[in-house]
Amino acid sequence: MSLGAKPFGEKKFIEIKGRRMAYIDEGTGDPILFQHGNPTSSYLWRNIMPHCAGLGRLIACDLIGMGDSDKLDPSGPERYAYAEHRDYLDALWEALDLGDRVVLVVHDWGSALGFDWARRHRERVQGIAYMEAIAMPIEWADFPEQDRDLFQAFRSQAGEELVLQDNVFVEQVLPGLILRPLSEAEMAAYREPFLAAGEARRPTLSWPRQIPIAGTPADVVAIARDYAGWLSESPIPKLFINAEPGALTTGRMRDFCRTWPNQTEITVAGAHFIQEDSPDEIGAAIAAFVRRLRPA
């Protein structure tokens, strides 16, 4: 089943708010919408989407400034905040005419964006599968100890050099949170959107500055609190793909996720970018989840 380093599907492009955004859109029927986070792209789902072939319209979008989507110009520290990403993604999903039986498959910042969208469009959501997600606002004590100093540095002036010049999120954080070594071809695919030093890498710095930690940024904390409260009560069917050992959805956040109603849980091997360690297990679980939601 594995495609290895080969991308799944063919990239399509659409103009959103004056910028060109990239997405994959394969198959027909009700959509299964796969959304990546930082610093990845739709490429993250290449070995998972094939498991869902024939179960619906398979869509994976590249966030603005990431993957093959356009960069924002002018760029700077104020760009690529959560609210700006949400504006672009909302408009893209609206343009894709998703209908009212959407299954969301979300990870990392794709989870925050997806959970937020689902709360605001709950009547259109058939189910939510999530993994290594931003399920609620957190404190620094909840953050993985081995990564805490680095992520605190990202939120300081030091982050500018670490990310914009040294490309630390792609070169260090990404491979460091995958259990297996990535091939040169796989690393090349992840590097490609961020080869140029400077503002081209801004999305990968803005994202860690948006994590709702210790009350900041206030707008993202409020959004995460709202969707966390909703998910903890919503009857919408859920699939929690737990990671062992995991990185983000661990400890207090994992315990909170396990309280959500109408939820199935499986566990797969992986740290944070678990799609690179357990794609077949993840793909099979998502396919089984969709089949239960959409019996023939």
UniProtKB/Swiss-Prot annotation:
Localisation:
Periplasm
Output the Gene Ontology cellular-component terms: periplasmic space
What does the annotation give as the result of altering residue 108 to A? Loss of activity
Recorded effect of pH on activity? Optimum pH is 8.2.
Pathway this chain belongs to:
Xenobiotic degradation; gamma-hexachlorocyclohexane degradation
Work out whether the entry's keyword set contains NADP. no
Listed result of changing residue 132 to Q: Loss of activity
Provide the alphabetized UniProt keywords: Detoxification, Hydrolase, Periplasm
**Similarity-based family:** Belongs to the haloalkane dehalogenase family. Type 2 subfamily.
Q: How does it assemble?
A: Monomer.
Under NCBIfam families, the record lists: PRK03592.1
Protein name (database record): Haloalkane dehalogenase
Source organism of the structure: Sphingobium indicum (strain DSM 16413 / CCM 7287 / MTCC 6362 / UT26 / NBRC 101211 / UT26S) (Sphingobium japonicum)
Task: Tell me what gene encodes this.
Answer: linB
